[in-house]
């Protein structure tokens, strides 16, 4: 076990929202002049206040945003500029798109356990609405904006921490969810209106769902076998709020309704923010509490699946 615990957390959700039927999506509007970095800073300040800490008490800042604020430098450096300028706290990005937060928790738990860092700030911030294609109704009505920051630190309680983690990628799904433009394959300098869709989010939802449905049962079978646990040992599953198909996937995995959190209707898919935000909402509502064993899990573009079993 990697002995870590939550020291504090904070979230930020834009006040503005749009409705698609009974589905609510919080999105930044141009008039608000709120950047992805601004949202991250709001969440971080709340997390520091919640933990009763100052930024100087943080040993590492990790940004897990799926989409960067700018290509260079890393988003974590831009966040550092706003909250830690004048310090030499290391800052880095960890990116597996929607499951970036889980990947970061997994990686940083090893570094905390090894003594490299005592306390790590992991922040996810997404302005997904800016890159949506209005012609793709499914994804246009699904995604939302927001930010979440959680501070993890070394735990002296040997019963708390990461019990087991697993990540797998099936690259046959690499082009089922993508933004093709903006990198070296299709740089922004060759942008033209004829190919504008290359620079907007493109998701083939049915392909993703079918691939996930084929791969996830075996993924979870491995997770439980290697960890020595079963669903009866888990108090709550905190899944990525991928889509309204969440209930179908959970049912296929044999996870009963009372053992997972579903807030898709109220918040939609906030990309890398979804998992930590759902975790924080569960903590606030008392749906998970100290001593519980939980699973943070989700799928991401790639197709990647991620899971961390955590004793909180």
Predicted regions and their residues:
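A structural motif shared across PLP-dependent enzymes of the aminotransferase-like
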Residues: 14-20, 38, 67-78, 242-245
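Flexible, glycine-rich active-site loops centered on histidine and acidic residues
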Residues: 113-147
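Conserved catalytic cysteine-centered active-site region
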Residues: 27-35, 65-120, 251-279
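Acidic, glycine-rich active-site loops and adjacent beta-strand->loop/helix elements
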Residues: 64-69, 96-99, 124-129, 168-170, ...
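Catalytic phosphate/nucleotide-handling subdomain of diverse soluble enzymes
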Residues: 277-297, 303, 307-312
């Amino acid at each position: 076990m990697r002995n870590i615990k939550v020291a504090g957390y904070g979230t930020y959700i834009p006040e503005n929202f749009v409705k698609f039927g009974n589905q609510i999506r919080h999105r930044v509007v141009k008039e608000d002049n709120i950047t992805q970095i601004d949202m991250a800073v709001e969440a971080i300040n709340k997390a520091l206040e919640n933990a009763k800490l100052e930024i100087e008490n943080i040993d590492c800042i990790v940004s897990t945003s799926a989409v960067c604020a700018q290509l260079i430098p890393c988003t974590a450096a831009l966040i550092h500029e706003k909250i830690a300028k004048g310090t030499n706290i290391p800052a880095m990005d960890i990116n597996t798109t929607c499951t970036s937060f889980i990947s970061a928790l997994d990686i940083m738990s090893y570094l905390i356990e090894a003594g490299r860092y005592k306390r790590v700030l992991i922040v996810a911030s997404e302005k997904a609405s800016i890159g949506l294609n209005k012609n793709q109704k499914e994804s246009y009505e699904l995604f939302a904006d927001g930010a979440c920051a959680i501070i993890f630190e070394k735990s002296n309680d040997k019963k708390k921490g990461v019990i087991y983690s697993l990540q797998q990628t099936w690259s046959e799904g690499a082009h089922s969810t993508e933004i093709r433009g903006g990198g070296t394959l299709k740089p922004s300098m060759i942008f033209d209106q004829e190919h504008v869709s290359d620079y907007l989010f493109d998701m083939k939802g049915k392909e993703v769902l079918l691939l996930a449905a084929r791969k996830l049962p075996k993924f979870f079978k491995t997770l439980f076998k290697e960890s020595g646990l079963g669903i009866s040992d888990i108090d709550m599953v905190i899944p990525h709020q991928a889509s309204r198909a969440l209930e179908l996937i959970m049912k296929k995995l044999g996870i009963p309704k009372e053992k997972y959190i579903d807030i898709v209707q109220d918040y939609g898919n906030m990309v890398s923010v979804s998992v930590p935000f759902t975790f924080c909402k569960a903590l606030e509502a008392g749906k998970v509490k100290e001593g519980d064993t939980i699973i943070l899990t989700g799928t991401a573009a790639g197709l990647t699946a991620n899971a961390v079993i955590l004793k909180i």
